[in-house]
């Protein structure tokens, strides 16, 4: 099913801790056409550089061989492998379709989530390994930072609450969607650090910034902290007030 194809792709990205994974055009031809079309149009599959090696089909030995490409004067391109195992085989042509690759990584997944939920994707840098900020998500009661966790499997994280990304994915009108209602519930139900713990985090960040950039103003320090997940949506003036306490 289309959902199964997306879950398979997300599982591979999670297994590589968010790093880029590639899928060949040959493999994609075995996936549901609707899934492949949606994955490409929604930015979850992006063009990758052509494969540098292939399994040679010149004989039954199925050797993995490097691909050589020649561009002729008229602009036409020919790719092939050179067999060094058999005396009766030399160049084995490789169709361009066999070399085509598509890629997906955690950043592409974050972009898909932001677009699906109508979020402005944040420029906040990760403050924790394996936890990527996506954007400020609104519930019915509060607004909090939505993040993507990439440890082993992909999960949406709000505050201390987490949910596997695969559990909130569906397909509608030929495109992949996220369950907005469930996400709103996550935002409203998320428990964040208590007030004193939050203030302590700001004070620690303030001291670290002062040590790194000693000649900046307190306003500048508070503005930098406001761009990080530990701000929890608070503005710079609120942070400044409590980081100096």
Regions found by a protein language model. Name each.
Residues 1-204:
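Low-complexity, PEST-like segments
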Residues 170-245:
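K/R-rich mixed-charge low-complexity regions
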